[in-house]
Structure formats: C-alpha cells, structure tokens
C-alpha cells in the first residue's frame, strides 16, 4: 500500500526525448544525500563518459561542495527547481547512492513515476516492489555505477510503457483507494 501522494506535476511528466544527462535529486541538508553525492564524485565521476551532463537539483548543498563541483565542466547545480519532473522524465536516469536511511524514498518513487530509471544502492529501493526492477538499477560498487551510466540503453517507448504501468500499479495500491473502500 502506498501512503503518500504523487503531485500532478509528477503524473504529467512524460518522457519526450532522452537528453544525455543524469540527475541527482534531493534535499541536500540531509547527510545521507550529501554523503552519497560526495561518494559518487570521489568514486565514479572521474570514470564516467564526460559527454553526459550531471544536473543536481535541490536546496541546501553545502557551499564547499558547490565550489568543488564547479571544477567539473559537465556538472550543473540548479538548486531549487519549481517543477523538476519534466527534466527528470527526459533524463537518462536519476542517481541515488544512499548508504543510510530508512523507508521508501519519495524521490525514487517520483522518478520511477516519471518513467525514469533510478540507479542506486539497495537502500534507495527499500519498500518498493521488485516487479519494477528493470528500472531499479541496483549498484553497490563504483564499477557497477560506471558500467550502468556508460551503457544504459532503455528506449523512449519502454520508458513510456513503464510509466503507464508504474502509475497504474501506484493508483491500484494507493492508500486513498483503501480508505475510500472502507467508507
């Protein structure tokens, strides 16, 4: 049963064209997010295809980290974005290297609902049905991240079909449906 609401912007974000970019999405005042981002740039960033743009969305990224990220030509820190979901839908994937935290990660569910694959640790996918594993790309070591980013090939049609299937499942298992059935 899903116990949170998907915003209309998430539902309306449909992949139109795949841009050669990956997204990091989160509240950067949360240490589990910043630790994962820092790990990614220390262990993965130098080895991935430099033609792939890395976009970081969300508030609170520490000033020191923002300064370090400016050293990378293919990295852009956007900070707060009013509606990031179309950008997410049109990206190759969302990256979520989490090494701590508990429960379902809303950013992962929102990304999947946009039809966008998510590359992350097992912690990133806690509580999400494994039937969506084609778009839940689990990686624990840098080599797996590098390989996945540099070789990901999921078609636009597959992403649109996945989005439709994911949202159908989400709606069927939403807590709102269970509450209204009991009333």
Which residues are covered by each model-predicted region?
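Conserved catalytic-core segment of nucleotide-activated headgroup transferases in glycan assembly
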Residues: 4-68, 77, 81-84, 89
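Glycosyltransferase donor-binding loop in the core domain
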Residues: 26-32, 103, 137, 167
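Short Ser/Thr-rich beta->loop micro-motif in glycosyltransferases that lines
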Residues: 79, 96-102, 123
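Short alpha-helical segment that forms part of, or immediately flanks, the ligand-binding pocket
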Residues: 85, 106-113, 126-127
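Short hydrophobic beta-strand element within catalytic cores of glycosyltransferases
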Residues: 94, 107-111, 117-121
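Short acidic/histidine- and often glycine-rich active-site loop of Leloir-type glycosyltransferases
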Residues: 122-138
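Conserved acidic donor-binding segment of nucleotide-sugar-dependent glycosyltransferases
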Residues: 135-143, 149-156
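A charged, aromatic-enriched C-terminal amphipathic alpha-helix characteristic of glycosyltransferases
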Residues: 153-183
